[in-house]
Each structure stands twice: as C-alpha cells, then as structure tokens.
Amino acid sequence: MGVFGYITDLKTVCIEKYADVEVTGGDDESSMLFRFLDDVLFLFNAEPFLIPKVSLNSITHTVQFCFSISFAKKIEILEINWQEFRIRARCYGEVFNLDKHPQGTEVKAITYSNMQIHKKDDRVDVYVIIDI
C-alpha cells in the first residue's frame, strides 16, 4: 500500500498474519475513504503492523476491481458499499522489525486535502495526500 511504501521498502515485508478492518457510516465517500485509511495506518501505529497486501472478494454495487497503489503487491477489498459508506478489508502483512525493514519516513496522518475519488467502469482511482 502506498502509505506503507513511505515507511519501509515493501519488498522486505512478508505475509505472516492478517488483520480485518471494517469502516461503516460516514457522511460521504471521502469520509469513508479517510476513515478506512486512518484505521489501516492505526494498525501500524498500534502494533506496528505492515501491510503490503489487502484482500478483495466481492464488491457491492460496482464491478469487481483491484486498486492500483504504488508499492503494493496487490490490494483487494472484501466489500465496498458506496451508498452506505461501508468498507470491509482483510489486511495481510507482518510486524515492523528494524532488523529486517529499513526505516523510511514516518507517516503522521491521512488528510482530506485535495482528496479525490474517480470511479470508472473497471476500477476506482483515489488520490490522497498524507502528512509526513
């Protein structure tokens, strides 16, 4: 995931465990995306847990797609419902280890600044500025 690409070299991250993330509610699509990315960033700050991959089985009210985000091997979502502002995802990765993972830039926060969501027939492109 692009956010974790700032924190370390994702090529050094193995998939050893997973964490489920679910975001429900919100005022609009931007707030849903913000809350989801904020929860994913919280996984790193709480454990610290690195996520090079996130898993996708079905999409509600849209065509199945994969997000293309820099440095991610593959990003998949279990469910995304644009009308009810709900995202469910399974995040795969491992605990951050300074002996294994080179330390990059600290990501302080996700921001709403210039956040954009562009829905297309076969994918959704998102643009998010992070505070480093």
PLM regions with names:
Residues 1-132:
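Intrinsically disordered, low-complexity regions
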